Amino acid sequence: HFPNIARAVREVARVLKPVGLFLLVDNIALSDPELDDFDNRVEKWRDPSHGRSCTREEWHAFFTQAGLVVAYEENFRKTHNYDDWTVRSQLPAEEKAALEHFILASSDKIQHSYDIKTRSDGHLESFTSNAILLKGRKG
């Protein structure tokens, strides 16, 4: 949701005490262009204020450029119940249906990567996204 992520990380580094730590938890896109595009299109569709889900490599570059050393990293996956996920953003019913159709019509590669699950009635039940925890300290 930051319009300039690199600048935001630089500002964190600037105000961080010399012994301070910066902990970041965020969704990430995968480095594959098709998966990156899918992730960011889905997030933006659900939440128009979404800026960009960065890749792991982009986050490392932001930290490095800001003078932060990655002291710890954990990559993990989060499963989202589709109905709950869209309710939280107050997505209108017609947009929810259109987004569901887009997700269900995605390529086999996307279906597998995001572990897209359907209910017995054919509607989208859940999908799994990628996230990262980074702990940075001043270099």
Task: Please place each PLM-identified region on the residue numbering.
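Conserved Class I S-adenosyl-L-methionine
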Residues: 66-139
